[in-house]
């Protein structure tokens, strides 16, 4: 191989595997890319501590936070853990540069278990056409229940059935489709408000026009 700082001129040595002991020494920390990294989690904890949430109470607050989570990152959080408002924890995620969804994903299992024990299914299932028998499949971070690298639950709960997983997949695809339709409609409305459609010349004044609804 080339010496340090010298240009490589021959690739032969780089087509060989390392020695067995060297290869075995190469390890990674098991983690999920949907959950916060250790560094991200520490940033959130420290940001929350500056607002009055002690590190000792962080896990409990994060579970309540996840139980309070709705459909999107723009959810309006109304709950509290003791006196600490969940809205403040959402803002601390923002301060730390970590999406709210990541924190909720990480604490899904205990939050899900607590909701199951209290028989409080996610409110979304009633207005999202989710079959009653699969109402728990509408849980916002349902995928985390199948992720071995997130925080486990001390309270037992029923594992998702294959049917629940299938319903959740359909549910997610339907929500993505609806979101795309809403974004398209909002974009069209914004263009109309400005007096023109994308790619079209500005409309002249004092005229009456029929604008066909988006397909």
UniProtKB/Swiss-Prot annotation:
Q: Where is this region: Disordered?
A: 1-34
Composition-biased stretches, type Polar residues, lie in 24-34
Keywords assigned: Capsid protein, Helical capsid protein, Ribonucleoprotein, Virion
One example GO MF annotation: structural molecule activity
Record flagged with keyword Nucleotide-binding: no
Q: Where along the chain is composition biased (Basic and acidic residues)?
A: 12-23
InterPro entries, per database record: Pltvir_coat
Instruction: State what this protein does.
Output: Required for genome encapsidation. Forms ribonucleoprotein complexes along with TGB1 helicase and viral RNA.
UniProt similarity note: Belongs to the potexvirus capsid protein family.
Q: What is this protein called?
A: Coat protein
* Source species of the chain: Foxtail mosaic virus
